[in-house]
């Protein structure tokens, strides 16, 4: 447990900028496990707070003012596409040739798709996905997790019940760590700081550590109120493109992609959260998955 917490706290990436959503896909195929890239970021950073662009396969191209010397300079394309000029010297986004992607430095750059195929890097994956645009295969193809594909064992019912215990505790600890280190870093808003301050100053708070699930379960019962805000906060961190009260597959990716290799119940957990099977996870579904009572689910806590 300690290993995956450390990994998540060290994750880094590039910018999340996807203005359109992608629903949760059907994930019936067998997928496999991996080791993910670790980069230098502030200790305590949430993987969805740092900028993670590896997972935005739903982003649209955005056009800005064309610079005369280089029309492509301010013409941004989504992952898998590059800017080229047409016969009128107008910039346009075209699919990137996978062979033009930088050579991977090591295994940590590899990614696994949901059809269980390993790609040398996210660049290779998105370039390949782009060439399949408009096809059924391309629509279903997603980046599943970071690292080369490996066998991921089935998630047993008993293991599934343990997953939210660890996840809840981790969310609380991430917030406390951000609060402790947030002097001039603007890691939290003032409203968020006020909420977390109460948790931080509570003497009954279970300190971060590799605790047995029995202790985590007891702590949730005894200190239930400490967990309400962290669960809402994480939903807000994920619900960004667009901010609509629902989590799509693309919005979940920054959290689930690094988790899957280390927590094999990740995919099944998020699937069970989607109670109405509409391929999106609403706030009430998300909070319910973490054991938050219906009366305590409040959209105003998503700040």
Swiss-Prot record:
Residues modified by glycosylation: 116
Signal peptide feature range: 1-17
InterPro entries, A to Z: EF-hand-dom_pair (IPR011992), EF_Hand_1_Ca_BS (IPR018247), Fol_N (IPR003645), Follistatin/Osteonectin_EGF (IPR015369), Kazal_dom (IPR002350), Kazal_dom_sf (IPR036058), Osteonectin_CS (IPR001999), SPARC/Testican_Ca-bd-dom (IPR019577)
One GO BP annotation of this record: semicircular canal morphogenesis
Binding site for Ca(2+): 274, 276, 278, 280, 285
Listed GO MF terms: calcium ion binding; collagen binding; extracellular matrix binding
Protein's UniProt keywords contain Signal: yes
Disulfide-linked positions: 72-83, 77-93, 95-130, 101-123, 112-149, 155-265, 273-289
Domain EF-hand: 261-296
Keywords: Basement membrane, Calcium, Copper, Disulfide bond, Extracellular matrix, Glycoprotein, Metal-binding, Secreted, Signal
Chain ranges of the Kazal-like domain: 89-151
Cellular component GO terms held in the UniProt record: basement membrane; extracellular space
Residue span, Follistatin-like domain: 71-93
Compartments, record wording: Secreted, Extracellular space, Extracellular matrix, Basement membrane
Keyword DNA damage in annotation: no
Family: Belongs to the SPARC family.
Function: Appears to regulate cell growth through interactions with the extracellular matrix and cytokines. Binds calcium and copper, several types of collagen, albumin, thrombospondin, PDGF and cell membranes. There are two calcium binding sites; an acidic domain that binds 5 to 8 Ca(2+) with a low affinity and an EF-hand loop that binds a Ca(2+) ion with a high affinity.
Protein known as: SPARC
Organism for this UniProt entry: Bos taurus
